[in-house]
């Protein structure tokens, strides 16, 4: 039974993990140099496309203002309901405020006041609802506790009723037994 030589070699080759001496010592930077060059080439190719006249960012003026302003302005453009809170952040925000949230418009001021009043009423109703719910939960807990006590004290009544039912469910069979004691001083008992 002879095995093929290429699957089970008789001897092993020992390879060095170090590069051949004519390449010089290998550093961390050298290992990733081809990858870094590829990224650099991709960035250069993208820069050429971005600087061409056909390509323009829609908010190029915001890119020059700074990171914080840019994020705020972008957020306000997507959701202009926050413009009142952000009105002092940048020029674009102030423009949006004047168009979307016109603070000087009396009709909008009246609507804002109605909204605030409605929110306050909703908050009061929510608090009242929570109070009523808590009260109901307390009463339900007390009622269930009372029912458990009644069940413990008077469970024998329902058991007796179940045992004394005959064929007719509305007719209870009750038997009386009179006990007499041999002692004449103890009265007779009916059970």
Swiss-Prot record:
Subunit structure: Antiparallel disulfide-linked heterodimer of an alpha chain and a beta chain. Self-associates and forms higher oligomers. Interacts with a broad range of misfolded proteins, including APP, APOC2 and LYZ. Slightly acidic pH promotes interaction with misfolded proteins. Forms high-molecular weight oligomers upon interaction with misfolded proteins. Interacts with APOA1, LRP2, CLUAP1 and PON1. Interacts with the complement membrane attack complex. Interacts (via alpha chain) with XRCC6.
Residues annotated as glycosylated: 79, 116, 142, 162
Family matches, as InterPro entries: Clusterin-like, Clusterin_C, Clusterin_CS
Positions of post-translational Phosphoserine modification: 184
Residues forming coiled coils: none
Protein's job: Functions as extracellular chaperone that prevents aggregation of non native proteins. Prevents stress-induced aggregation of blood plasma proteins. Inhibits formation of amyloid fibrils by APP, APOC2, B2M, CALCA, CSN3, SNCA and aggregation-prone LYZ variants (in vitro). Does not require ATP. Maintains partially unfolded proteins in a state appropriate for subsequent refolding by other chaperones, such as HSPA8/HSC70. Does not refold proteins by itself.
Protein name per Swiss-Prot or TrEMBL: Clusterin
Family: Belongs to the clusterin family.
Modifications made to the protein after synthesis: Proteolytically cleaved on its way through the secretory system, probably within the Golgi lumen. Proteolytic cleavage is not necessary for its chaperone activity. All non-secreted forms are not proteolytically cleaved. Chaperone activity of uncleaved forms is dependent on a non-reducing environment. Polyubiquitinated, leading to proteasomal degradation. Under cellular stress, the intracellular level of cleaved form is reduced due to proteasomal degradation.
Membrane topology: Peripheral membrane protein
């Amino acid at each position: 039974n002879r095995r093929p030589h290429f699957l089970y070699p008789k001897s092993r080759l020992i390879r060095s993990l170090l590069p051949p001496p004519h390449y010089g010592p290998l550093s961390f930077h050298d290992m990733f140099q081809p990858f870094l060059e590829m990224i650099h080439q991709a960035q250069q190719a993208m820069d050429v496309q971005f600087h061409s006249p056909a390509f323009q960012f829609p908010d190029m003026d915001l890119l020059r203002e700074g990171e914080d302003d840019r994020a705020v302005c972008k957020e306000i453009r997507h959701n202009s309901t926050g413009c009142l809170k952000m009105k002092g952040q940048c020029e674009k925000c102030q423009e949006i405020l004047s168009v979307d949230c016109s603070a000087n418009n009396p009709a909008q001021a009246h609507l804002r006041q109605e909204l605030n009043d409605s929110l306050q009423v909703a908050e009061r109703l929510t608090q009242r609802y929570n109070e009523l719910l808590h009260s109901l939960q307390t009463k339900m807990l007390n009622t269930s506790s009372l029912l458990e006590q009644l069940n413990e004290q008077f469970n024998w009544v329902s058991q007796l009723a179940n045992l004394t039912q005959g064929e007719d469910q509305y007719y209870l069979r009750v038997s009386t037994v009179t006990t007499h004691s041999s002692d004449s001083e103890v009265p007779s008992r009916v059970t």
